[in-house]
Amino acid sequence: MPRSLKKGPFVDDHLQKKVDAENAKGSHNVIKTWSRRSMIVPDMIGHTIAVHDGRKHVPVFVTDSMVGHKLGEFAPTRTYRGHVKEDRKGRRR
């Protein structure tokens, strides 16, 4: 079930403070965060946010089409290496 509209979007306070500070300076430095649960708000457009995926920080450049989604959606936590091919050279009939 989606979040109630009267509550508004959830953004961690420490992340919002970092975004506000970057907007006040007018710079677009990379903002490092562990908050995958924070929702992308219009203040973040144009910033690069490094979202933690469990072992490293994945840089995510925020565009206007991402508003309303969560940061964790853009930093996958699982690496898919494909299915292992079966080795038939050693098999005998």
UniProtKB/Swiss-Prot annotation:
NCBIfam families: rpsS_bact (TIGR01050)
Native organism: Nocardioides sp. (strain ATCC BAA-499 / JS614)
Single annotated GO MF: structural constituent of ribosome
One Pfam family hit: Ribosomal_S19
Residue ranges, compositional bias (Basic and acidic residues): 9-23
Family: Belongs to the universal ribosomal protein uS19 family.
Keyword Hydrolase: no
Gene3D superfamilies, alphabetized: 30s Ribosomal Protein S19, Chain A
Keyword terms, alphabetized: Ribonucleoprotein, Ribosomal protein, RNA-binding, rRNA-binding
Gene: rpsS
Domain of life: Bacteria
Function: Protein S19 forms a complex with S13 that binds strongly to the 16S ribosomal RNA.
Protein name as catalogued: Small ribosomal subunit protein uS19
One GO cellular component, as annotated: cytoplasm
Keyword tRNA processing: no
